[in-house]
Amino acid sequence: MQFAKYFGYLDGVPAQIYMRVLGIDPGSETLGWGIVDGSGLKYAAVDFGVVKSNPRNPFPQRLANIYEGVSAVIDSFQPDVVSIEEAFFAVNVKVALKLGQVRGVLLLLAEQRGLKIAEYAPRLIKQTVVGYGNAEKHQVQEMVKVLLRMKSVPTPHDAADALAMAICHFHHAGVRDRIERSVRKIP
């Protein structure tokens, strides 16, 4: 499926009709990414993969590896938006802190590149993609395959989760934009 990049008007306001979304499943050892092109609820996968970091390397070195890996993805695919999972409360505090640092690096990178940033709760992503907020990982992967008309489930699961985040953005972008515009109008 090919999409042409063009702009139109929504409620008299210039609006981007086509989007290229980079979905990111943050992780300090394996970070999933997925590129999805589309317009409205018509979208297609462009590419997906992972950025792997050696768990034996010092954590700052892993963060640098993540920054460089995602920078390369952004340079290659030129997305308009980065869709990333919101911070969530993990059972292990150490893991939650590391994930927060990874998210910080990713948010900084997106901001430096002038990309729109959309953050979604894990439950909303599952609700959007599967129709059930407590869906299992395999259910999310299967629905990503169906929604993106893929022949097989995208692997590894980190990449499938990243594609799910991009899909989630296509379903919620219009609502987010309308809310942002209405908030800007309030004196």
Question: What annotation goes with each model-predicted range?
Answer:
Residues 1-187:
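Phosphate- and other anionic-substrate recognition elements at nucleic-acid/protein interfaces
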